[in-house]
């Protein structure tokens, strides 16, 4: 594991990041475009230098290497992207308007952030609502399509009534809702949650790990909804901030993720590693996230996020 301990809060350096992403993408055999990456860093320079930056990958060889900034202040990521040509007018006027609508809730205090693909550039926008918010507010925002709203009753029946984040994927045309699910997780709960996406229940080994690492008070649970069809394509369970690996065995990860763990640098004073189990009708995989710089742990603690350690 790459761990670098420093006394001062970690700061973003573009030259260092370019070296790191170039080396990491090569190490895990992920597609990479230097031109696209430099463009993204230039367009959102303020957010990279003043926010928090982290890595994200999956356990599937050949999948994208993603990086993300979390903003510490309200910004209009949609207008920035549209002005720079990172979003087509069509996307900016449809999915972009949805992001802007959610950001306008609660007197415009929600904070937008962005995900980037190391090859394709900007792929997703996030909105943090400043805490746990009622599902009614989120689904009732202007412009939320009926394909998303139609699931409200089912979510509430499963106890999914509080949302902290949403995300809009510009490339996949999907919306993610991030709930606080009641813990401790039970097999019955996991079976019902997986059924949202037409997925089988977790295997015994998967459930044992999920029960061990998901916070027993409550944990982050996400659904991914296709905007056109309204289908729930995937659900995900997030174990945020795994314990030190030297102190406690982590959930099982494959060789692809082991290489990521080996080569992905983190400059935060306290490293954050997270694993997420993703289930869908046709796709089941594991996601892994790691802090890069900007001090992620204090940020997510400030959100009231329940952690695994």
From Swiss-Prot:
What gene name is given for the protein in this entry? ptf
Q: Where is the signal peptide?
A: none
Read off the InterPro entries from this record: Aro_prenylTrfase, Prenyltransferase_CloQ, PrenylTrfase-like_sf
Q: Which GO terms describe its molecular function?
A: prenyltransferase activity
Q: What does this protein do?
A: Prenyltransferase that attaches isoprenoid moieties to carbon atoms of aromatic substrates in an enzyme-catalyzed Friedel-Crafts reaction. Shows specificity for dimethylallyl diphosphate (DMAPP) and does not accept geranyl diphosphate (GPP) or isopentenyl diphosphate (IPP). Prenylates the artificial substrate 2,7-dihydroxynaphthalene (2,7-DHN), as well as dihydrophenazine-1-carboxylic acid and 4-hydroxybenzoic acid at lower levels.
Organism for this UniProt entry: Sclerotinia sclerotiorum (strain ATCC 18683 / 1980 / Ss-1)
What's the protein here called? Aromatic prenyltransferase
Q: Which SUPFAM superfamilies match?
A: Prenyltransferase-like
Q: Please verify whether the record's keywords include Transferase.
A: yes
Enzyme Commission code(s) on record: 2.5.1.-
| Pfam families xrefs | PTase_Orf2
**What keywords are annotated for this sequence in UniProt?**
Prenyltransferase, Transferase
Instruction: Please name the top-level EC class of this enzyme.
Output: transferase
Q: Which residues form a coiled coil?
A: none
């Amino acid at each position: 594991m790459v761990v670098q301990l420093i006394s001062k809060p970690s700061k973003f350096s573009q030259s260092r990041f370019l070296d790191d992403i170039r080396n990491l993408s090569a190490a895990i055999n992920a597609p990479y475009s230097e031109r696209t990456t430099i463009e993204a860093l230039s367009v959102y320079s303020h957010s990279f230098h003043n926010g928090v930056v982290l890595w994200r990958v999956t356990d599937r060889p050949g999948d994208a290497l993603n990086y993300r900034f979390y903003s510490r202040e309200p910004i209009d990521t949609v207008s920035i992207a549209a002005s720079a040509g990172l979003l087509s007018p069509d996307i900016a006027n449809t999915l972009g308007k949805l992001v802007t609508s959610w950001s306008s809730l609660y007197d415009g205090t929600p904070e937008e952030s962005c995900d980037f693909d190391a090859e394709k550039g900007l792929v997703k926008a996030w909105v943090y609502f400043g805490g746990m918010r009622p599902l009614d507010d989120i689904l009732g925002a202007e412009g939320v399509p009926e394909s998303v709203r139609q699931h409200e009753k089912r979510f509430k029946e499963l106890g999914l009534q509080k949302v902290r984040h949403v995300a809009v994927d510009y490339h996949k045309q999907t919306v993610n809702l991030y709930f606080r699910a009641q813990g401790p997780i039970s097999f019955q709960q996991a079976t019902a949650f997986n059924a949202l996406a037409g997925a089988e229940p977790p295997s015994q080994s998967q459930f044992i790990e999920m029960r061990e690492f998901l916070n027993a008070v409550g944990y982050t649970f996400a659904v991914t909804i296709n905007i056109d069809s309204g289908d729930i394509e995937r659900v995900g369970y997030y174990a945020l901030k795994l314990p030190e690996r030297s102190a406690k065995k982590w959930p099982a990860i494959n060789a692809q993720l082991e290489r990521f763990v080996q080569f992905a640098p983190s400059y935060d004073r306290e490293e954050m590693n997270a694993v997420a189990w993703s289930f869908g009708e046709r796709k089941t995989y594991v996601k892994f996230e790691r802090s890069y710089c900007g001090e992620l742990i204090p940020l997510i603690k400030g959100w009231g996020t329940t952690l695994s350690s």
